[in-house]
Amino acid sequence: MAETATIARPYAEALFRVASEAGAGNLGAWSELVSEMGQVAANPDMQALATDPNISGDKLEEVFLSVLKSPVNDEARRFVKLLVENSRLTALPEIAEQFHALKNAREGSSDVEITSAFPLDASQTNELVAALERKFGRKLYAKVAVDPSLIGGVSVKVGDEVLDTSVRSRLAAMQAALTA
């Protein structure tokens, strides 16, 4: 994984520079396109195509671009061509992650992973995100998951920081205190 991250970094930085030069208004569109490209490249069938020595670079590029639903501009086409020529299409999911991290850093925002024991409705999610934004002092983009093993409460991850208020973690802490 570290090797893929190292390979992906210069590609992500270069693509981010190109997207930034296109204007701040286009950064959102670029982010969506790069995210979609990363998802398509992560598909096992696409991974198999990308590593198949019998598939020509032109054919791989054509197939990859035809699968994308978002409109693809000339810069993105050239970027895909560069990845195919350098046999780096399989690194595109990591490139997309690093691109997203660069975008968040530019905007002063972060992603937040919220895991709840029970499904949260939109108002609960918005209220929780608003409280977390006040705590962390920046805009947060929520990704919500449900994990019944938490028993109750939520676990929140923002970057490297984890806030675990789940019943499961409290029970584990009580067990550790009682057995110590």
Swiss-Prot record:
Keywords: ATP synthesis, Cell inner membrane, Cell membrane, CF(1), Hydrogen ion transport, Ion transport, Membrane, Transport. It is a peripheral membrane protein. GO terms for cellular component: plasma membrane; proton-transporting ATP synthase complex. GO terms for molecular function: proton-transporting ATP synthase activity, rotational mechanism. The keyword DNA-binding does not apply. Gene3D superfamilies: N-terminal domain of the delta subunit of the F1F0-ATP synthase (1.10.520.20). Pfam families: OSCP (PF00213). It comes from the Bacteria. Coiled coil: none annotated. It is found in: Cell inner membrane. F(1)F(0) ATP synthase produces ATP from ADP in the presence of a proton or sodium gradient. F-type ATPases consist of two structural domains, F(1) containing the extramembraneous catalytic core and F(0) containing the membrane proton channel, linked together by a central stalk and a peripheral stalk. During catalysis, ATP synthesis in the catalytic domain of F(1) is coupled via a rotary mechanism of the central stalk subunits to proton translocation. Belongs to the ATPase delta chain family. HAMAP family: ATP_synth_delta_bact. F-type ATPases have 2 components, F(1) - the catalytic core - and F(0) - the membrane proton channel. F(1) has five subunits: alpha(3), beta(3), gamma(1), delta(1), epsilon(1). F(0) has three main subunits: a(1), b(2) and c(10-14). The alpha and beta chains form an alternating ring which encloses part of the gamma chain. F(1) is attached to F(0) by a central stalk formed by the gamma and epsilon chains, while a peripheral stalk is formed by the delta and b chains. This is ATP synthase subunit delta. It comes from Cupriavidus metallidurans (strain ATCC 43123 / DSM 2839 / NBRC 102507 / CH34).
